[in-house]
């Protein structure tokens, strides 16, 4: 997954997704936090195992280190809850978010627990897309739209329908996901052909691997 992106940012150690023991083994006295996606989107939509995230929460509490969730792809209704961590009942110390929060406008945000927020002072946290008045107004309007119309409930309902219907296709090997964040893995490398056929029928999807669409 890191191919073409070297050199990677120093100071980070990478562990195997859904492997709690590997995460534990990579931590030492210098570790200040663990960052993880509740659902890995780019690799082909791989939801975290509930016990994996619960185990990370317990481990971070025990070692007094931060648990951070990257919800750029999963946040704000896409997975059937307002935020994906709510599906798991695991509350992180910090959450990064973007994409859906702006309704198409470029904006990112980071939320923390009240305890962590105490260490921030004006100017301590900067962002390329922070504080743009137009984007902030768009984000507030988008949040109202999501919450007032409970779009996350629609994502849960429609996502369940799609996943159930996809099961009947003989070419499908596996279906993974939460809400409307769905990955479909085929028996054969036909993902790009399926993508083009979908576009012809006015359905926007993406092929993340030769045999996986999202």
Locate predicted features.
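Conserved N-terminal phosphate-binding loop of PLP-dependent enzymes in the Aspartate aminotransferase
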Residues: 1-214
